[in-house]
């Protein structure tokens, strides 16, 4: 009787765990940080021109600022998805 109640809980827990773990394993990230910046508006211009949703200039403790671009949607990071041809 206990096994019948435990199996659905175990199965649903494994499904949730795998849905959380899959993007981590595949290396997909909702943020792309590269390049130096001096201000958030400058970083935002660079990121939006590249097709990202927004950009934020993050500073570290060593006075080094890096521009981080945030994706509009997750499929933007999937290299296997190509753009449709322009006819």
Swiss-Prot record:
Domain of life: Eukaryota
Localisation: Secreted
Residues of the signal peptide: 1-27
Cystines in this chain: 33-69, 37-57, 43-67, 47-68
Coiled coil: none
Any one biological process term the GO annotation gives: defense response to fungus
Any single GO CC term annotated in Swiss-Prot or TrEMBL for this entry: extracellular region
Keywords: Antimicrobial, Disulfide bond, Fungicide, Plant defense, Secreted, Signal
Similarity comment: family membership: Belongs to the DEFL family.
Name the record gives this protein: Defensin-like protein 81
